[in-house]
Every structure is written in structure tokens, then in C-alpha cells.
Amino acid sequence: MSKQKPSLWRALRALSFIISIPLLIQYLVLKWYSTSQNTPTPVFHEPNHETNLTVWEVLSNDDRVSKFVDVIGKLPDIVRGLSAPQARFTVYAPVNEAFDSFYFPPDPPPFFGLFIAGCHMGPGPVPAERLPSMGTVSSFVNGDIFFTYKQRISVQKDKSGLTLNRAARVLPVNASQSIAVNGFVHHIDTVLELPNSTAHALRTRPELSKLRRGLEATKLSESIYDTNAHVSQTIFAPTNAAFDRLGKTATKFLFSHGGRPYLRALLKYHVVANKTLFSDSYWPHGGAKLMDLSLIPNKDSHQFDLPTLHNNLTLQVESRKIHKKWHLNVLKDQVAEGKSHDSIPVSMPDVILMDGVMHFIDSILLPPAKSEQRKTSWLSRLKSSLGHNKQSIEDLVTLLGPYIDEP
């Protein structure tokens, strides 16, 4: 298997993201130590299993993760944090075999170990029984340029088990290798890497080829790909199947020279700048704290009005817990006097990006009609619900015309 070679720009990006980790660890350790005299230490345990070992001791005693331990052991501040009984950590430890396909530079930069550490641990306890219900978990990598939020790691569940960032399979482990007095350890079969850019995500996803072509043709890619143009972003990414549902005639028109302004107006409705909504957490930015939906008691549904790239035009998005897992839906036309909504489900949530998050959708999002004469009829809604939502060129021109601007 070929080894993964991070390029220089990714290494520099790693430095910018995680350079604050030693300071963070030192601050947290001092805080934990200062409160330890007055605060009782709860012991996390599964039934019939208790431990007095710290996370660092659990890792050090486990031969399956010795290569990971070798990397972390060279970072005394992080070792000190993992050894603090008052700390609360969760570590996603790659097993030794995971490093066989991971590229170690012959002369790694000083921050290379921090890159490994930051991507594989986060604050707070996440026990094995809680992990399957989570859409994302926290790492110690900085998620924004202001160091307000910590980058998320996405969690996928299927019949085979759990996967992190659609790359690393969570492996079975016994209690003695996973439970510590100050947190939990999970074994994974792949080394996690820093999130890729939006451009890379679109370039490497064949099912998004039409979206990528549309962004580049309309020059929206210039701002969406440029991390200096925004703090963060949430992209509701229509797949090729979504464009196909518009119909060949409408799609051909949108990608023609004459239809390009309408395509630009359409795609701007799919991008949320400077707000980051994951399936189970929300970064409002502007100095506001992270909103963790799983920590809000007695509430299984949350709605968000997210500003799109169109002035004064928002997307209403709902995150709803179904069978203990959070699911995203983009709400469409309001019906029944505000009591219910049509919705478009997110088909693949939480594709973590360097500068935000991307959610795949299999239907195109159409902005609301500005004209009172262009209200959606019950027959149109019925056709849409049955999957027959092909649009005519006349319909698109009428709907999108008022939203046209120049690149």
C-alpha cells in the first residue's frame, strides 16, 4: 500500500491549526490541578469494571498502540495532560498497523507530533456506548482562525460498525484498554489527517463533478475556495443526481453561456458563509460559543436560519434526532399555515472541511419566488414529493431572474 505523503502546504496548514495545542494543554492542566483540591474526581466505568489508571497509563500499557504512544511520549505537555486525574479526555488511538500506510518524514518538523496528537484526541469523555449516537466529536485541532472552536471529527455508523471521518474504522477493544479514570480510549485502524480544502473535496468526489464545474464556470469558486474570503462556511452540495432531477433541458440551459447567471444565482443559495452547522453542533462564530445539540436536554429538534450568499435570503435547516442520531433536513415551502414543512433530507452529512463542513443533498434547493404570482401550487408540491421535480427553462428564468448578479 502506498504511503500517504502530506505536501508542504498541508504541513504548514497543520502548524497554523495546532500551534496552540501546547499552550492549551498547559492551561487546562493548571486549571485541573488548581480545582482538584476542592472538586471530587468522578470515576468513569462500565458495569463491573473500575480503574484508577489515567488515559496515558492505559495507552502506555497497550502494545497495540505502541507506535502512537512513541509519538505522544515525545510531547511532555500532552503527556502531563493525559496523566492528570482531573482531566477529561477522549483519545482515538491508531493501532500499530495504521502507521504502515502513513508517511513519516525522514526529518519531521517540530510540530509534526502535535499534528498527530491534535487529530486524535479531544476534550471531554466520550464512552463507547455514546459514540454511535454522535454525528461529530471534538478534536484538539483549532477549527477557526480565532481559535474559538475545535475541529470536529465526523462519526459514521453502518452495519459493519463505526467509522471516523469516513476513513478510520473503530475497532473492538476490551474495557481494560479503553476506560481510564480521566477519560476513554478508542482504537482506530487508520491515522486521521487534517481536513482537506473545499477545492480538494470537490475535486476528489466524482458525484460532485457538476457542482464543481458550476462553481468554476460561475466564478463562485474564487470566493468559496479562498479561505481568506470567509471565516468558515457550510455548503449544501447538490450531487450529480440532484442536477439530473432538474431534467436534461434545464441542466443544459444552466450550464450554457446564457444560463450561467442563473446557475450562479442558484448555487449561491446553497452556500452559507461564516456559519458552520454540523448535524449535531453549531458554530455561530462572531465570538459565540459552540452549540452542542446533544447537551440540550429534552429537545430533539432544532431549527436554524442560515444566511446564504444572497443578501437577506436564508436557508431554514432542521436538525432532528431520530433513533438517537441527529439528521439534517433543509426545509422548503411552508404549508398548513406554519404547522409543517416540506423538506429535503441531507443524504451524506458532516464532510469535514478545512474551512467548514459540506453536506450532500440529492435535490436542488430552489429559492423562494419573489413574485406573488409565482407561488408553488399544491400540484407542484405533489410532483416534487413524488420525485418529478423537473423544471422548465421558463420556470427557472422566472424564479432565478430576480436573484441574478454579476460575478
Swiss-Prot record:
InterPro entries: Adhesion/Biosynth-related, FAS1_dom_sf, FAS1_domain. Pathway: Pigment biosynthesis. It is found in: Secreted; Secreted, Extracellular space. It holds the Pfam family Fasciclin. Gene3D superfamilies: FAS1 domain. One of its GO terms (cellular component) is extracellular region. Residues 52-192, 195-365 form the FAS1 domain. Glycans are attached at N52, N174, N196, N274, N312. Transmembrane segments: none annotated. Residues 1-35 form the signal peptide. Keywords: Glycoprotein, Repeat, Secreted, Signal. Disulfide bonds: none annotated. Disruption phenotype: Impairs autofusarin biosynthesis and leads to a yellow pigmentation via accumulation of the intermediate rubrofusarin. It comes from the Eukaryota. Induction: Expression is regulated by the aurofusarin biosynthesis cluster-specific transcription factor aurR1/GIP2. Part of the gene cluster that mediates the biosynthesis of aurofusarin, a red mycelium pigment which is acting as a mycotoxin. The first step is performed by the polyketide synthase which condenses one acetyl-CoA and 6 malonyl-CoA units to form the first intermediate, the cyclic heptaketide and yellow pigment YWA1. The C2 hydroxyl group in the pyrone ring of YWA1 is probably formed during ring closure by an aldol-type cyclization reaction. The dehydratase aurZ then acts as the first tailoring enzyme in the aurofusarin biosynthetic pathway by converting YWA1 to nor-rubrofusarin. Might be part of an extracellular enzyme complex composed of GIP1, aurF, aurO and aurS. This is Aurofusarin biosynthesis cluster protein S. The gene is aurS.
